[in-house]
């Protein structure tokens, strides 16, 4: 199968640094969004390259788990890249990686969160990931609201 890619930009009111730093501390995500029930550190250190995390999520109303490894972090670019190791996504996709980059919004306050998903479907019957993009949009918006309420 051929590798494919989808992405989405989400405008938020929080600063890029604040959103990025919160996102690096994955253990706090369940406080900010109803889509994350928890995130356990299985190997390594929180927010460090090579760390392996077990995400407990609600996607399309269904409980899901995803075992991910942090592959790259760029502090200057406010970027984190994860690779999915185990879970439902690995049952449908040979390759699945996700990258989040947070940039200050040009010409205004706030920021833009860009999610990029790269994947290779196991066969033609497996759906493309456009529906999963909405999950990321909703998570970003809920985390933004949480960060704004925290001051």
UniProtKB/Swiss-Prot annotation:
InterPro entries: Bet_v_I/MLP, MLP-like_ligand-binding, START-like_dom_sf. Pfam families: Bet_v_1. One of its GO terms (biological process) is defense response. Belongs to the MLP family. This is MLP-like protein 168. It comes from Arabidopsis thaliana.
